[in-house]
Amino acid sequence: MIKIFELKSIISIKDFERKDIDYILDEASKLEDIAKSKECCDELKGKILGLMFFEPSTRTRLSFETSMKRLGGNCIGIENTRSCSVSKGESIADTAKMFEGYSDALVIRHELEGVSKFISDIVDVPVINAGDGAGQHPTQTLLDLYTIKKELGQIDNLKIALVGDLKFGRTVHSLSNALGLYDNVELYFVAPKELRMPQEVLHDLNKKNIPYTEVDSIEEIIDKVDVLYVTRIQKERFGDLDEYLKIKGAYIVNKKMLEGKDVIVMHPLPRIDEIATDLDNTKHNKYFNQAFNAVPVRMAILKTLIKNNPKWNHIE
């Protein structure tokens, strides 16, 4: 049975089994032609998606909006707390209940971990977590996996390095959890000691017997990996600007570093300067393809959740 059809909401990638992920990736592949042609279908005609974004977002918000419209639906939403009654003191719960009355599904982004789960417990429509603090970002993980499979033909048997802020980066937390579902995957975590992968993520990998190695520099692993997944070092996490500049400068990927190598480079974006622009026109650059892949993948997610609500049909 496909577990995704039992889920009312998508809150954490930990709720997925491999077959659920494979189902979404297959659905995304079928919908990619619609995404590329920039045409629309009628899969979700008459449906409305509520976008509740309490934290800044460009790609996630726009790709969800694009995905819904490509499926024939429409969107309503807020982009920050200033644009809704939360700024007047209204509770998140009341705002969510109001959105529930107007929408067939909700997409939530919030700076606090756990808000999406809280909202999913008080509304009857599907809820999609679009990032909660330093917690999870499950739909980003699905499009990351889609990109890897599309570019390399598989996810099994790959060596993948996650680089940058692994402590606070929710994308790498979710991605690590998901990669643990695949066979013979080896993970390399490249980060300064202040920003290493949280122990709870490492604990989950240990339980699944997923091999991983923690290193301090990109140079230690660059000859070993198939995928380099780069994230920005977050300036706001450092009290000392000099320390930030020192660490940031040690985690920059450029064209010269990758000469003669077949590694693909991914990034959830936005980038600051951790990937040099001289990489943009090389075979290594997959981060712009990755950004586009958000549309077919999120189309697949929306179609799966909304079209099957409220009966949640099961597929054997």
From Swiss-Prot:
It comes from the Archaea. One of its GO terms (biological process) is amino acid metabolic process. Its EC number is 2.1.3.2. It catalyses: carbamoyl phosphate + L-aspartate = N-carbamoyl-L-aspartate + phosphate + H(+). Gene3D superfamilies: Aspartate/ornithine carbamoyltransferase. Carbamoyl phosphate binds at residues 59-60, 109, 137, 140, 269-270. GO terms for molecular function: amino acid binding; aspartate carbamoyltransferase activity. PANTHER family: ASPARTATE CARBAMOYLTRANSFERASE, ORNITHINE CARBAMOYLTRANSFERASE, MITOCHONDRIAL. Heterooligomer of catalytic and regulatory chains. HAMAP family: Asp_carb_tr. Catalyzes the condensation of carbamoyl phosphate and aspartate to form carbamoyl aspartate and inorganic phosphate, the committed step in the de novo pyrimidine nucleotide biosynthesis pathway. This is Aspartate carbamoyltransferase catalytic subunit. It comes from Methanobrevibacter smithii (strain ATCC 35061 / DSM 861 / OCM 144 / PS). The lineage of its organism: Archaea, Methanobacteriati, Methanobacteriota, Methanomada group, Methanobacteria.
